[in-house]
Swiss-Prot record:
It comes from the Eukaryota. Residues 1287-1324 are annotated as: Interaction with MC4R. Residues 52-90, 206-244 form the EGF-like domain. This is Attractin-like protein 1.
Length: 1378
């Protein structure tokens, strides 16, 4: 037994008990014994595994506990057994061989690691039956797979591909999936990618044991006829190979309901009025049920997935499909639904095998379109084949593509044939995935009578097409209902959807219906009594974290067409799991028949669903509420099925009231048409937002016919560059990897954007020269129609002129006698446009388009008149990322070409196919790709692998060790028994050929582990695995690398070659030989160039390279990057600029260095030895300064004198500063004073300017302050006061009475606290004898004084206060000036 693999001796005997001893936790206590029968031994292994998992996952490092899962602890480090890796040897990574009669295998006690490749070979004896039980299996769905082969290599028949969560759903352990091989061998290969990892798997195996331990309903017995083989003796009322099928439950209700047939097929035979697997349901019944019919013959070769089935009479015709092995595959099968018998179609010639195609039946013919071909390249086809049921013969159709349509080669699509209201019979092909154009959202129509193909324009909602959806056609509503699929999602993402669309075939209108809430693809759909039944499918939609979604589903959903409602139906209540995807379903007599599919293995069973019968409902209320899964109507005192009624049944359907949609539900629709063409109750608001119809909106649209379709809405649905380029208004952004709409202003008003040009058609009658001038005035020229897009556009536009004849000039004229050319100087090729018969004639040298029965060119004199002209001008794309489309991934045939575009494509090395990254899952839905690459490419054949370790990493390779036993050998395709080769040139089968590694010549074949001695042919081994002495200039533990100073690939006897670096490097790249130059500024693979772009000069072939320094500048060199790691030297040169000044040098560095300085006057200095004269030689310094005298070195007589500085022997990283300078030692007084006064005057001028600015600012602020003060004073309260003046002895007359009392102030302004105030009075100034004031002076003045008012009497205060508050009051007393 191989190390690291757990096994136990002896096969389990189900009938014998097993004793297990359990000890309580803690150091003491009594022991207890648990007695288990043989049916529970797997359960014990599961507990043991979980206990081991918990112990290892919580274990401490090896230095503390010494725990290693598959290895031993040595010096606190785990030394792993072969095939195990990790700090605790907890991950598998290699090959294992198991030879025990039974045992188990696992990826490890914790989650498996990323990029894991593990292989197990279980070896029994020839033709032994080997059973695998997957008691635990959890991997990333559709990405991480376990492959099981019935043999000892991957070239043996494939029997199972496991992925996702394998969880039994029925009665626990007895339904654990079991895989069987019959060759005596089983090869299991596991591969995981780099997305996320799960808990892995725990697989039990046993040789010649009973299937599923007889499911607990039988006894495992040894066969009498064939020794060493066992079989199950089933208990009563159980049958099947594993005793897992119950029969005659409750004795079939005998005798009233039926009886049990114990001698024949062991099933219930019901009386006429009873039905069901146990005859417990009435005929007709108000309940539904599932059954598994007994199929005859039950051949495994029938199993397939992604096939298609149609019903013709009592036969279900099954065509195509995917299978593991096509050697015995039958393209056409039919199943008799009455007798449950399979028949193989007697077809001699026909199409190649394919899957993912579509089938549609019309009369006696079955139309098959598209699909993925099962050939070496695996291309998607656009072939249209017709199979005649009566003659059982194939014929092919080549339809004519109408107009400017495109026939898409698709897979994962669906098709239906119906008769339109126009009496035209048409096959409608819905969606699908095209390897060239990506996920298509188009409808394709094939008109059978005219044999024509068309891609029509559709109305209504803008829908998104995809792969693996299902669709049904309803005769009542004349519509096709499309559900689910794998699609392109917003934000350049891809995944499953739960969308439901309705396509009205006569009006070509899309409507979005209520989604199911359960995303899936590769499911089935049928229509029964007004309900669309959805079964199974792949529901895994996780991307970075597993949420428990299963790859294989048994979900059962029902959609009520009349009420737009979804219901979840109970899953099939059968004796085993029926999870699957990629199956087919048909309807006969109101029952659904499901066939085949994929659930880790290819299924060949048939499931039958019998829905309730409307006739069984006797009450009107029960009839109307029948369901889910069935639609009934009450008609004249009896209940009948939906299909038996007329089209008015929709109006009479009783549906639950629909709740108004919320705004959040409507927000998902980004365009007006999809917002209004759905059943969710939404409206399109004027601010380009979809909201609920119950929400307020100033201007809304509620009918899709009122919507304006914008280019952005169309372009966003195109998922590939090719499909984007087909739309003239879209362009592909290579950086964002999305299709974007071209702005409408690219060409301007009146112009049409067509391809890379703008075209404009004018119907005016002009000569050629005037037409050319007209276009010139519009910044264009007469159109050069060199592309098919431009020709098609012009021809279409000409047809729109119905009121007048338009035969426009185009930019084509005769250059010389025999040469016609376009205005853009391109030659006329007679491909996109052709001359009319008899043209060109000799009468004219200019061409125009003649709209005849067939539009074409006609020559005319350039001075004559033509009816119209076509102008053209270039268009400049605003998106700089828009470039021509790259080659589609599917057309790239090598790994290098496939992975050259970054992450756009993925290369599958096992199938030699390149696929789009966004379509990897649908390109390999059944795990056909064993390994993929997106960046680095590994050798595509075993022969390209040079070491045994690399060889055994690939599951299809083995290593042939040569007789030298030094590790040399060669890698070749093979199995555990020996190497293999192709059986023939045109035969893809491989056969064993031991002569490729002859054992008689002492060659050794290794398939599980490499030979112990792995010295690559450069040394012999001591102690079996230690290389004694590496020769041939090699080094390393296995002599796998070249010695320093040499390069090459010494693996498997390769040679090492000396590095060629011209003395400028000590080492080079070990594999490429590129030299790591030690002098900064020298570059090239062989250090043969100077880095002239960065001011390095010289010739490294004859000397070295120097950095040219400038005088009076300081340079800093930071050798800190990883590219500078090998640099240990840098050189400089400098030439004095002035002949009368000394040359100073200053250099310092962050690390110690050696310094050598030389000088030369010749032009060959630095290249010829002896031309330089040494000046300075220093070692191990960090700083140096010096000055070279111009007199000593005679700068004046040696104008070409050059100084060379060599800095060497420093360590990385380092920072170096160096400067050469020339200046006088005696200060020039004149220059000093000139400089001083210049600076002084400049400073003075700056000070003056600053002072002036300050003064200006101060004056401005002062003016503003005065203005504010005046405004404040002007806003103070004011009043008028009457003043009585005495002039001499005269009294004033205008007062009523004499003045009384003392003079009063004109104002009193109290201060805070009312203890002081400002008193204001009028004063009479001194006057002359005449009574008049002196000239130039005033006779009056206003005086103010601060007075104390705290001692005044209350009466006085009252009077004063009154006087202040009533300033307008006229005093009645005579006043006197004081």
């Amino acid at each position: 037994m191989e190390p690291g693999v757990r096994a136990r001796s002896g096969a389990p005997q189900p009938a014998s008990p097993v004793l297990w001893r359990a000890r309580p936790a803690g150091g003491g206590g009594a022991s207890s014994w648990l007695l288990l029968d043989g049916n529970s031994w797997l359960l014990c292994y599961g507990f043991l595994y979980l206990a081991l998992y918990a112990q290892v996952s919580q274990s401490k490092p090896c230095e503390r506990t010494g725990s290693c899962f598959s290895g031993r602890c040595v010096n606190s480090t785990c030394l792993c057994d072969p095939g195990w890796v990790g700090d605790q040897c907890q991950h598998c990574q290699g090959r294992f061989k198991l030879t025990e009669p039974s045992g188990y295998l696992t990826d490890g006690p914790i989650n498996y690691k990323y990029k894991t490749k593990c292989t197990w070979l279980i070896e029994g004896y020839p033709n032994a039956v080997l059973r695998l039980r997957f008691n635990h299996f959890a991997t990333e769905c559709s990405w991480d797979h376990m492959y099981v082969y019935d043999g000892d290599s991957i070239y043996a028949p494939l029997v199972a591909v496991l992925s996702g969560l394998i969880v039994p759903e029925v009665r626990g352990n007895e339904t654990v999936p079991e895989v069987v091989t019959t060759s005596g061998y089983a090869l299991l290969h596991f591969f995981s990618d780099a997305a996320y990892n799960l808990t892995g798997f725990n697989i039990f195996y046993s040789i010649n044991s009973c299937p599923n331990n007889c499911s607990g309903h039988g006894k495992c017995t040894t066969s009498v006829s064939v020794a060493s083989q066992v079989y199950c003796e089933c208990d009563k009322y159980w049958k099947g190979e594993a005793c897992d099928i119950p029969y005659c439950k409750a004795n079939c209700g005998s005798p009233d309901h039926g009886y049990c047939d114990l001698t024949g097929e062991k099933l219930c035979v019901c009386n006429d009025s009873w039905q069901g697997p146990d005859c417990s349901l009435n005929v007709p019944s108000t309940e539904s049920y599932w059954i598994l019919p007994n199929v005859k013959p039950f051949s495994p070769s029938v199993g397939r997935a992604s096939h298609k089935a149609v019903l013709h009479g009592k036969f279900m015709w099954v065509i195509g499909g995917y299978t593991f092995n096509y050697s015995s595959f039958q393209m056409v099968l039919n199943y008799n639904l009455e007798s449950s018998i399979w028949n193989v179609g007697a077809v001699s010639r026909g199409p190649l095998q394919r899957y993912g195609h579509s089938l549609a039946l019309y009369q006696e013919n079955i139309f098959m379109y598209g699909g993925r071909m099962e050939t070496s390249d695996g291309n998607v086809t656009d072939e249209l084949w017709v199979f005649n049921v009566r003659s059982q013969s194939w014929s092919t159709k080549t339809p004519t593509v109408l107009g400017h349509s495109q026939q898409y080669a698709v897979e994962g699509h669906s098709a239906h044939i119906m008769e339109l209201d126009s009496r035209d019979v048409v096959m409608i092909v819905i969606f699908g995935y095209s390897a060239i154009y990506g996920y298509t959202s188009s409808i394709q129509e094939y008109h059978i009578s005219s044999n024509t193909w068309l891609v029509p324009e559709t109305k209504g909602a803008i829908v998104q097409g995809g792969y693996g959806h299902t669709s049904v056609y309803d005769e009542v509503t004349k519509s096709i209902y499309v559900h689910g699929g794998y699609k392109a999602l917003p934000g350049n993402k891809y995944g499953l959807v739960d969308d439901l669309y309705k396509y009205e075939v006569n009006t070509r209108t899309w409507t979005i219906l209520k989604e199911s809430g359960f995303a899936r693809y590769l499911h089935s759909a049928v229509l029964i009594n007004g309900a669309m039944l959805i079964f199974g499918g792949n529901t895994h939609n996780d991307t970075s974290l597993s949420n428990g979604a299963k790859c294989f589903s048994a979900d059962f959903l029902a959609y009520d067409i009349a009420c737009d409602e979804w219901k979840t139906l109970p899953k099939p209540n059968l004796h085993r799991d029926v999870n699957r995807f990629g199956h087919s379903a048909v309807v006969i007599n109101g029952s659904m028949y499901i066939f085949g599919g994929f659930s880790s293995v290819l299924l060949n069973d048939i499931l039958v669903y019998k829905p309730p019968n409307c006739k069984a409902f006797r009450d009107e209320e029960l009839c109307r509420n029948a369901g889910p899964g069935i639609k009934c109507v009450w008609n004249k005192n009896h209940c009948e099925s939906w299909e038996s009624g007329n089209t008015n049944n929709i109006l009479r359907a009783k549906c639950p009231p629909k709740t108004a949609a919320t705004d959040d539900r409507c927000y998902r629709y980004a365009d007006c048409a999809s917002c209004t063409a759905n059943t969710n109750g939404c409206q399109w608001c004027d601010d380009k937002k979809c909201i609920s119809a119950s929400s307020n909106c100033s201007t809304s649209v509620r009918n899709y016919t009122k919507c304006h379709i914008r280019n952005e809405q169309i372009c966003n649905k195109l998922t590939s560059c090719k499909s984007c380029s087909l739309n003239l208004n879209c362009q592909w952004d290579q950086r964002q990897q999305e299709c974007q709409a071209l702005p409408a202003h690219l060409c301007g008003e009146g112009w049409n954007h067509v391809g890379d040009a703008c075209l404009r058609i004018n119907s005016s009658r002009e000569s050629y020269d005037n037409a050319k001038l007209y276009c010139y005035n519009l910044s264009g020229n007469l159109a050069s129609l060199t592309t098919s897009k431009e020709v098609e556009f012009v021809l279409d536009e000409i047809q729109k002129f119905t009121q007048q004849k338009v035969s426009p000039w185009v930019g084509l004229r005769k250059i010389n006698i025999s040469y016609w050319g376009w205005e853009d100087m391109s030659p006329f090729t007679n491909t996109s446009l052709q001359w009319l018969p008899g043209e060109p004639n000799d009468s004219g040298f200019c061409a125009y388009l003649e709209r005849a029965a067939v539009a074409g060119l006609k020559a005319n004199p350039c001075t004559s008149m033509a009816d119209g002209l076509v102008c053209e001008k270039p268009v400049v794309s605003p998106n700089q990322n828009a470039r021509p489309c790259k080659k589609p991934c599917s057309l790239r045939t090598s790994c290098a070409n496939c992975t050259s575009s970054g992450m756009e494509c993925m290369w599958c090395s096992s199938t030699k196919r390149c696929v789009d990254s966004n379509a990897y899952i649908i390109s390999f839905p059944y795990g056909q790709c064993l390994e993929w690459q997106t960046a680095t490419c590994s050798p595509q054949n075993c022969s390209g692998l040079r070491t045994c370790g690399q060889c055994l990493e690939q599951p299809g390779c083995g290593w042939c060790n040569d007789p030298s036993n030094t590790g040399r050998g060669y890698c070749i395709e093979g199995s555990s028994r020996g190497p293999m080769k192709l059986a023939g040139v045109h035969n893809s089968d491989v056969v064993l050929d031991t002569s490729l590694c002859p054992k008689e010549k002492n060659y050794e074949w290794s398939f599980i582990q490499c030979p112990a001695c792995q010295c690559n042919g450069h040394s012999t081994c001591i102690n079996n695995n230690v290389c004694e002495q590496c020769k041939n200039l090699t080094t390393g533990r296995q002599c796998q690398e070249c010695m320093p100073g040499y390069y090459g690939d010494p693996t498997n006897g390769g040679q090492c070659t000396a590095c060629t670096c011209g003395g400028h490097a000590n080492v080079c790249h070990l594999h490429t030989g590129k030299c790591f130059c030690t002098t900064k500024g020298i570059k090239g693979d062989q250090c043969q160039l100077c880095d002239s772009e960065n001011r390095y000069v010289g010739n490294p072939l004859r000397g070295t390279c120097y950095y040219s320094l400038l005088i009076d500048y300081q340079f800093t060199f930071s050798l800190l990057q990883e590219d500078d790691r090998h640099h240990t030297a840098i050189n400089f040169i400098a030439n004095p600029e002035q002949s009368n000044k000394n040359l100073d040098i200053s250099i310092n560095a962050s690390n110690n260095f050696n310094l050598n300085i030389t000088w030369s006057v010749g032009s060959t200095g630095g290249t010829i030895s002896g031309e330089e004269t040494p000046i300075v030689s220093k070692t191990n310094i960090k700083e140096y300064r010096d000055s070279f005298s111009y007199e000593k070195f005679n700068f004046r007589s040696n104008p070409n004198i050059t100084f060379y500085v060599y800095v060497s022997n420093f360590s990385w990283p380092i920072k170096i500063q160096i400067a050469f300078s020339q200046h006088n030692t005696i200060m020039d007084l004149v220059q000093f004073f000139v400089t001083f006064f210049s600076c002084f005057l400049s400073l003075l001028l700056v000070a003056a300017v600053v002072w002036k600015i300050k003064q200006t600012c101060w004056a401005s602020r002062r003016r503003e302050q005065l203005l504010r003060e005046r405004q404040q004073m002007a806003s103070r309260p004011f009043a008028s006061v009457d003043v009585a003046l005495e002039v001499g002895a005269e009294q004033t007359d205008f007062l009523r009475g004499p003045l009384e009392g003392a003079p009063k102030p004109i104002a009193i302004e109290p201060c805070a606290g009312n203890r002081a105030a400002v008193l204001t009075v009028f004063l009479c100034l001194p006057r002359g004898s005449s009574g008049a004031p002196p000239p130039g002076q005033s006779g009056l003045a206003i005086a103010s004084a601060l007075i104390d008012i705290s001692q005044q009497k209350p009466s006085d205060n009252k009077d004063k206060t009154s006087g202040v508050r009533n300033r307008k009051h006229l005093s009645t007393r005579q006043g006197t000036c004081v």
